[in-house]
Amino acid sequence: MEERLVSGYELTEDENEFSLRPRRLSEYIGQQKVKETISIFIEAAKKRNEALDHVLLFGPPGLGKTTLATIIANELGVDIKITSGPALERPGDLAAILTNLGEKDVLFIDEIHRLPRIVEEVLYSAMEDFALDIMLGKGPGARSLRLSLPKFTLIGATTRAGLLTSPLRDRFGMVHRLEFYSVEELMLIINRSAALLKTEITPEGSFEIAKRSRGTPRIANRLLKRVRDYAEVRSSGVINLENAKAALDLLEIDELGLDPTDRLILKTMIEKYQGGPVGIEAIAAAISEEVDTIEDVYEPFLLQIGFIKRTPRGRVVTKLAYDHLGIAYNKNAGELSLW
């Protein structure tokens, strides 16, 4: 899959984004309810001199789950170890990390829904009893050895909470969903990032970037950098409405943040399948893309803005999408054909 500017997933170019990330809860913009709840539990844990309870963060990619995990560790004044579900292939991989944690440290596992089952089962006793059960030997003579672990905090992150098993999900004391950001919140993030990048930006320029950022801070910061490049080369270096609009139009990111692939999906559904209902497999085949990629990368935002609907018979393009694309809406097709 090619790297998309408007993808919420981390791209190669985002590796240098750490300088823009907030380090304290007071600097973290948005997610007010989540932030307030976590702040209370952090203070309570510090007062009791205990490890924070385990935390599960879920929601679309790019909303700040990794950033929030790092902030939690900073607020607790402890170290954080960052890994991911796919990186923990064997129980030994997890054991090596757990045995090197300090008291009250944070272990952050991104994409926790992709943990191999055998590794997940080792995690149960670690989360609940702060212990590792290790099997010594094989066959009838095998015996179990319990190894004590420091009391740590596990923070799991996932974009697909529904794929977590019940035993794992039930072991998290705190479960928080991160929501898409408002345009106003994204403007605050863009203005903060512009200041850190030493780039001058007008309110109109900030608004233009924010409204095309799909409610996602990671995308907002990515687009800000691209618009900054355009402003420095084609203008005075100040990001205003004119050069923000010109830069984003050049990148083919429209007023709502849709890119060419988003529009291709919608037009394919309209032109080849009369707006639906159409199965996800048919859409994937028509645009030569994987089903999982469409479900994980493209579809969530189109659902969020109401451009497509999921129905028992398949996906349907709504009138909103027709209007946005400038295509005449056929009342005998699409969503109305369901009835």
UniProtKB/Swiss-Prot annotation:
Protein name per its UniProtKB record: Holliday junction branch migration complex subunit RuvB
List of residues binding ATP: L20, R21, G62, K65, T66, T67, E128, D129, F130, R171, Y181, R218
Molecular function per GO: ATP binding; ATP hydrolysis activity; four-way junction DNA binding; four-way junction helicase activity
Family: Belongs to the RuvB family.
Reactions listed under catalytic activity: ATP + H2O = ADP + phosphate + H(+)
Record-listed E.C. numbers: 3.6.4.-
Subunit text: Homohexamer. Forms an RuvA(8)-RuvB(12)-Holliday junction (HJ) complex. HJ DNA is sandwiched between 2 RuvA tetramers; dsDNA enters through RuvA and exits via RuvB. An RuvB hexamer assembles on each DNA strand where it exits the tetramer. Each RuvB hexamer is contacted by two RuvA subunits (via domain III) on 2 adjacent RuvB subunits; this complex drives branch migration. In the full resolvosome a probable DNA-RuvA(4)-RuvB(12)-RuvC(2) complex forms which resolves the HJ.
CDD domains named among the record's database cross-references: AAA
One cellular-component annotation, GO: Holliday junction resolvase complex
Subcellular localization(s) per the UniProt record: Cytoplasm
Alphabetized UniProt keyword annotations: ATP-binding, Cytoplasm, DNA damage, DNA recombination, DNA repair, DNA-binding, Hydrolase, Nucleotide-binding
Domains (record comment): Has 3 domains, the large (RuvB-L) and small ATPase (RuvB-S) domains and the C-terminal head (RuvB-H) domain. The head domain binds DNA, while the ATPase domains jointly bind ATP, ADP or are empty depending on the state of the subunit in the translocation cycle. During a single DNA translocation step the structure of each domain remains the same, but their relative positions change.
Amino-acid positions noted as binding DNA in the UniProt annotation, renumbered to this chain: R310, R315
Large ATPase domain (RuvB-L), as annotated region: 1-181
Pfam families xrefs: AAA_lid_4, RuvB_C, RuvB_N
InterPro entries: AAA+_ATPase, AAA_lid_4, DNA_helicase_Holl-junc_RuvB, P-loop_NTPase, RuvB-like_N, RuvB_C, WH-like_DNA-bd_sf, WH_DNA-bd_sf
Organism field: Carboxydothermus hydrogenoformans (strain ATCC BAA-161 / DSM 6008 / Z-2901)
List of residues binding Mg(2+): T66
Function: The RuvA-RuvB-RuvC complex processes Holliday junction (HJ) DNA during genetic recombination and DNA repair, while the RuvA-RuvB complex plays an important role in the rescue of blocked DNA replication forks via replication fork reversal (RFR). RuvA specifically binds to HJ cruciform DNA, conferring on it an open structure. The RuvB hexamer acts as an ATP-dependent pump, pulling dsDNA into and through the RuvAB complex. RuvB forms 2 homohexamers on either side of HJ DNA bound by 1 or 2 RuvA tetramers; 4 subunits per hexamer contact DNA at a time.
PANTHER family assigned: HOLLIDAY JUNCTION BRANCH MIGRATION COMPLEX SUBUNIT RUVB, PTHR42848
4Fe-4S as UniProt keyword: no
Region spans: Small ATPAse domain (RuvB-S): 182-252
Stretches the record annotates as Head domain (RuvB-H): 255-339
Domain of life: Bacteria
KW Transmembrane (keyword) present: no
GO terms under biological process: DNA recombination; DNA repair
